[in-house]
Regions:
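Oxyanion-binding "anion nests"
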Residues: 237-278
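Acyl-CoA/ACP chain-elongation machinery
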Residues: 160-179, 232-235
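Glycine/charged-rich beta-loop-alpha catalytic/anionic-binding loops adjacent to active sites
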Residues: 69, 101-106, 127-138, 187-194, ...
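Short glycine-rich phosphate-binding loop at a beta-alpha junction
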Residues: 100-108, 273-281
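Short, well-ordered amphipathic alpha-helical segments that serve as non-catalytic structural scaffolds
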Residues: 54-58, 81-95, 255-270, 320-324
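Short beta-strand segments
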Residues: 28-31, 139, 164-170, 211, ...
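Claisen-condensing/thiolase-fold acyl-transfer catalytic domains that form or cleave C-C bonds
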Residues: 7-11, 15, 85, 111-113, ...
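Condensing-enzyme catalytic core mediating Claisen C-C bond formation in acyl metabolism
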Residues: 2-77, 185-254, 339, 351-352
Length: 352
């Protein structure tokens, strides 16, 4: 007889990708905002010098292993919400639309100052959006922005709104200071460096996109279709807060690339094997190389921003895409690719 005080769950064995397609959804504008303060990896190593000497470790992991030479930070008076609003304003201006037509705004940032209210509601206020504009956060680790585009497209395709604004603002000052302080503590070990290493690879920045109907916005870029896939058995491999980020680096790399390959094999990989650009979530040289190899794609078509910006979380994909816009031409086919903590994988096809 089962104990009624204990919940029992049955595992579902059905496997597969979640797939979607849109007929008339497009990116009207997409922008990136650089955090202005540059922090080099050499500067981080200099701060960690007492730790390296004490545990007998060599500096240079950020550059030699992760391939990150520098990252950015916001000034102390610029918070996550301000960073999101900065990108949102820029995206609205570049889109050329009247902001009163925006019917949905979502903030997809990992970084947040509070549990409630949402970050989106403050960005809504800062940008002077209408009272009919739905506003809430979407939180899904580094895939949040891609989920935001999908949600926006769903609203538009259903005829419920005309335009949506997806924003994201990330900052690293607090978590990296906490990580360095923790490593400089006399009790820290080399194992602490490896379990906290991911927090040192993070970068600050913001991004935003206005989403609308392709038919109503000449020169916009279609959101064609996409795939999502979950492997939630790996939800403990990367767990983060503003205080710290604990990561099983090898297991995360192995499980993430495995999930990416399984999702790729079930998606339309033949059609996606020869895209003009692949916009990856930006983590490190090791992660990018592993995904390029396992998907069998041309590395020359994979632009990288992590060497000089670090991993900007959910902002990384739109940030990198926005940086790539000057080199894209009408007719180019673009695939956004991401694996986020949880684990979840995503592929979203764009027609430029």
């Amino acid at each position: 007889m089962r104990d009624s005080s204990v919940l029992h769950f049955e595992r579902v064995s059905v496997s597969g990708n979640f797939q979607f397609s849109f007929d008339d959804v497009a990116i009207v504008s997409i922008v990136a905002c650089d955090a202005p303060n540059i922090v080099t990896s050499d500067e981080v190593d200099a701060r960690l010098a007492p730790f390296y000497e004490r545990v007998g470790a060599e500096p240079g992991l950020l550059q030699n292993l992760a391939g990150i030479t520098e990252h950015r930070q916001w000034p102390e008076d610029v918070g996550f919400i301000e960073a999101s609003a900065l990108a949102g304003e820029k995206a609205i201006v570049e889109s050329g639309i009247d902001r009163s037509r925006i019917g949905f705004i979502t903030n997809t940032s990992v970084c947040r100052d509070r549990l409630e209210p949402s970050s989106a509601v403050t960005v809504h206020n800062r940008l002077g959006l209408s009272s009919h504009c739905i506003n809430y956060d979407i939180s899904n680790a580094c895939l949040g922005f891609i989920n935001g585009i999908h949600m926006a497209g769903t609203f538009i395709e259903a005829g419920q709104i005309d335009y949506a604004l997806v924003v994201d603002g990330e900052g690293t000052r607090e978590i990296q200071q906490n990580t360095i302080d923790r490593l400089l503590d006399e009790s820290s070990t080399i194992d602490d460096l490896f379990s906290n290493f991911a927090s040192l690879t993070l970068g600050s920045g913001s991004a935003a996109a206005v989403i609308g109907r392709h038919s109503e916005n000449p020169g916009s870029h279609r959101v064609v279709r996409g795939d999502f896939r979950a492997a939630s058995q790996h939800h403990n491999l990367c767990v983060g807060s503003l205080e710290s980020m604990r990561t099983d680096t090898k297991a995360l790399l192995d499980s993430g690339t495995e999930l990416g390959k399984v999702a790729w094999d079930e998606a339309d990989k033949d059609a996606w094997g020869d895209m003009d650009r692949y916009i990856f979530h930006q983590i490190s040289r090791v992660h990018a190389g592993a995904m390029i190899d396992i998907l069998g794609i041309d590395p020359e078509r994979v632009p990288m921003t992590f060497p000089t910006y670090g991993n900007i979380g959910p902002a990384a994909v739109p940030f990198t895409l926005a940086k790539e816009v000057p080199s894209l031409k009408a007719g180019d086919r673009v695939l956004c690719v991401g694996v986020g903590s949880g684990l979840n994988a995503s592929f979203v096809e764009l027609a430029w």
